[in-house]
């Protein structure tokens, strides 16, 4: 897929419409390589990505269910189950986070957060260019 075609044709795909197979190890590696090429003032690389799949999705579902219980004690069991199932809608989740460095740098926190967003966008674009759907949630 040509670069401009990939950029202009990418759309978010709801987790409800994502299915297997998940990207292979080589496809993931290519996508993470694209993420590493993101604009990054100061070359701090503040982004961190956590890949969740397999049993990890079930454990994450339990975390979602517990969060729903704590947010709404006495919630209908269907609400709790719906929260649990959100983690199981796709074969792979990638959690993106910014680890903001505050000491020893003049780079403002907001620029580090923006760099993480850029890396995440590169990741989404790379998966799209390889034929996969994805959504930032």
Describe the role of every protein-language-model region.
Residues 1-89:
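N-terminal amphipathic, basic helical "cap/leader" segment at the start of enzyme domains
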Residues 35, 94, 100-137:
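Small-aliphatic-rich amphipathic alpha-helix that forms the alpha element of a beta-alpha
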Residues 17, 96-97:
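Short beta-strand element of the conserved SAM-dependent methyltransferase core
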Residues 89, 93-95:
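A structural motif
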């Amino acid at each position: 897929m040509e670069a401009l075609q990939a950029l202009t044709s990418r759309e978010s795909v709801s987790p409800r419409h994502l299915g297997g197979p998940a990207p292979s190890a080589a496809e993931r590696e290519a996508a993470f390589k694209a993420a590493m090429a993101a604009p990054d003032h100061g070359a701090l690389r503040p982004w961190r990505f956590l890949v969740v799949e397999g049993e990890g999705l079930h454990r994450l579902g339990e975390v979602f269910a517990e969060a729903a219980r704590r947010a709404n004690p006495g919630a209908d069991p269907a609400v709790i189950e719906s929260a649990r199932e959100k983690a199981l809608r796709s074969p792979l989740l990638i959690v993106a986070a910014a680890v903001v460095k505050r000491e020893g740098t003049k780079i403002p926190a907001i620029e580090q957060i923006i760099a993480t967003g850029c890396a995440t966008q590169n990741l989404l674009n790379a998966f799209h260019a390889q034929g996969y759907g994805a959504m930032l949630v």
